[in-house]
Amino acid sequence: EVKYDKLSINLTNYELKVNGKVVDTPPKEMELIYHLASNPNRVFTRDQLLDEVWGFDYYGDSRTVDVHVKRLREKLEGVSDQWALKTVWGVGYKFEVKDKN
């Protein structure tokens, strides 16, 4: 389980909670947010995410990642100012966690 301010991601039972309430989230979105949040502030390219979340045998379009990120943002937008799902232009995505200092 990965926890941040107002967010809990439990991959064991595929449960995403925002403010303590379960948010309906498809399996790949769960796996994607879990992967990003488990590696805070690390930038992943679309290809890395496809390999690491979808698997090496995935032959779909890399824009699949964009669609899943968009859907996650719709669920998580404005929940906390301590973390955010960020686009790193020209590179990929990261789960950005603010420094507590």
Residue spans for each PLM region:
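DNA-binding patch around the recognition helix
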Residues: 1, 24, 69, 73-101
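A short, conserved alpha-helix in the catalytic core of glycosyltransferases
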Residues: 31-37, 66-73
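Conserved catalytic core of two-component sensor histidine kinases
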Residues: 26, 59, 66
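Short helix-coil junctions and helix-kink-helix linkers
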Residues: 52-57
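Short, Lys/Arg-enriched segments at the junction into DNA-binding effector domains
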Residues: 1-43, 47, 96
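Short, flexible micro-motifs
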Residues: 58, 63, 93-95
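A short acidic, leucine-rich amphipathic alpha-helix
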Residues: 48-50, 72
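Alpha-helix N-cap and coil->helix boundary residues
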Residues: 44-48, 60, 64, 80-83, ...
